[in-house]
C-alpha cells in the first residue's frame, strides 16, 4: 500500500508524464474510463463477468498446455500423469488452485440461481433487476476502496522511498461514515488498521484503532462530502510523489 511503482490502484492510474505523452483522443478515453458513472457497468463487469472470463480462458489455457505436454511426452516415449499435471499447473489467470475451485463452484451455483430465478419471474425481468442490484452494489464497494487510497494528500511513494508504515497510515484514509454504514461495510473504513496488519479481522478493526489512537495522528479522516473530489485524482506524479488531477 502506498507504493505506486508496484500497484496503481483499482483504476490502474498512469503517471502525469505518461498522460502528457498521450494524444488527445487517448487522454479523453483515459478520463472517460475513470469517470465515476462508469463504476456501474464497470462494477458489474468486475464482479460478474470478469471472473467467468478468467475461468474460461484458464480452462482453454489448461487444455492447450496439457495437449502440448502430452504430445511432447509421447514423442519421448512417456505417458503424461494427467492428475499430477492438472494439480501442479500454474494458471496465468489465477494465483492459487483454491481460487480456481472457488470461482468454478461459484459459477456453477450462479448458473443454477440464474436459471431458477429467470424461470420464476421471467428472464428479462430477472436480468434487469440483477444488473441494477449487482452493478449498484459493486459500484459502491469499488468507490469505497478507491477513496480509501485516492484522496488529497495520500501517501504516493515510489519503490525507493516507500515505507510500509507510512503507506498504511498515510496512504489509507479514515472514512467517516454513520454507524449503520460502518456496520454494512464491516468497519472497512478503518482501512489503515487493515493495512498495518491484514491478520486483524474486521470485527476487531475499530477496537485496534481506539486502542492505538495516540499512534495514529497522521491518519487522514475523509468525510462523505469530500468523496467527489477524490475521483479527480487519477494521475500519479512520480516526481513530487503525489496524486494529482489531469488538469495539472
Annotated model-derived regions:
Residues 102-118:
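Hydrophobic core of alpha-helical transmembrane segments in multi-pass integral membrane proteins
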Residues 28, 104, 127-132:
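Hydrophobic alpha-helical transmembrane segments
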Residues 1-103, 153-242:
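Membrane-embedded catalytic scaffold of the fatty acid hydroxylase/desaturase
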Residues 245-246:
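Long, charge-dense tracts
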Residues 114-129:
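Helix-coil boundary and interhelical linker segments in multi-pass alpha-helical membrane proteins
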Residues 146-154:
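A cytosolic-side transmembrane-helix exit/cap motif
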